[in-house]
Structure formats: structure tokens, C-alpha cells
């Protein structure tokens, strides 16, 4: 066997259908689009159109609203905090707050504060100062010998 003798497996490649290349090709002239009409023109698909059936976006009712005053917290898991401590990006001996998490690259932006969740394990004894935390997260932090200070009651 030589490199110039290597072929694809049978059925691995398929010849593409060349549309609009003369009537002898079998898919010339209208190129499989039928005759005239909206769907024969370029930009064929009509988004959300279901053939005259009432489309789903009109069948389903409107619901809810966007609260412009809603607080948006950045979620951080205990596992991410532990990984940052292990990588020596976070100093566990100092108080860890939103600014420290941002400097360590754990979060990108602070938004309305940081909320800590209990995903992952925490072995380091850390002192956290965050906007909120879940109850299991608080338990895990205290079990590891750390402490947590909540800055706002809204994120609980």
C-alpha cells in the first residue's frame, strides 16, 4: 500500500448536489424550488411560520415581566474557592471578599455581590465576607474551621 493508493471508505464521502447547472443535470432552472412564490425566492425560510397553523409564539400566553430592580449575584462554589487556595491565588489567612475573588480570577465581575454555594469540598480555613450564601455552604465553611460574614440578608 502506498500513500497515493489510500481511498476513503465506501460511502464515507457523498457527491454534493450542484443546483441550477442546466436542465440536463436534473436539478437545473428552478433548482428544486418549484415555481415562483415566496419560497422560490432567495432567503427562503420564514422564521416562526408554521404553514398557516397558529405559530407557537402566538399559541402560548405572555407571562411575567423583567424586574429592572432585581439583584443579580455572582455565584461561586466552595470547590472553586478551594481550587484558588490550592493554586495559591487566594490567601486563606486573609479575609476573602468580592475584590479578592476578582483579583484571584475566580469571578469576572462583582455585579450586586457574591453568593457562595456548597458545590465541592472546602478543606481550607477561610474567612469569607460575601453578600450571601446557602445554608449548606455556611455549614461546610464552619465545619472546615472558617467563618462567614453576610453583607446583605437579601441573598440568603
Swiss-Prot record:
Biased composition (Basic and acidic residues): 1-13
Biased segments, Gly residues type: 21-35
One Gene Ontology biological process: translation
Keyword rRNA-binding on entry: yes
Intrachain disulfide bonds: none
Short name of one Pfam family: Ribosomal_L27A
Ranges for region Disordered: 1-41
Molecular functions per Gene Ontology: rRNA binding; structural constituent of ribosome
A Gene Ontology term for the protein's cellular component: cytosolic large ribosomal subunit
UniProt entry keywords in alphabetical sequence: Ribonucleoprotein, Ribosomal protein, RNA-binding, rRNA-binding
Family affiliation: Belongs to the universal ribosomal protein uL15 family.
Subunit record text: Part of the 50S ribosomal subunit.
Function per UniProt: Binds to the 23S rRNA.
The protein's name: Large ribosomal subunit protein uL15
Organism: Sinorhizobium medicae (strain WSM419)
Lineage: Bacteria, Pseudomonadati, Pseudomonadota, Alphaproteobacteria, Hyphomicrobiales
